[in-house]
Amino acid sequence: MAAPSPSLIKIVAPIKPVPFKRVMTSGKRRFNSARYSQFKDALGFFALKAMHGQEPLQGAIKLSAEFYKRRKGILTGQWGDVDNFLKAVLDSLNGICYLDDGQVVQVSAVKKFGEPRVLIELEELQ
């Protein structure tokens, strides 16, 4: 089977979405939470698989993301802000799908109920 078009990348990550949280400090040391670091590593793994050995995208990028959680409670409130989920995705894909998240010029994101997962579509704009 041929690799997908290098200007369109689809990532399906069957992992629970984790929002970005501010970097924690301990004395002079700065670190992310273990949960956030594990999410970034896992999403990076699925992104590498989706790249099929391609080089990172070079141009302006449109990013669409869907974040799914099991139906418990409501989509608003304590589950996390959609912009923090996006920040986690942008950080995770740096150097894998694109050289720098500054290349992302258009975003779309939604939180939904369903089997926990993250769906991402990246399209290089002409």
Listing of model-derived features with the role each one plays in the protein:
Residues 1-126:
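Acidic, proline/glycine-enriched N-terminal capping motif
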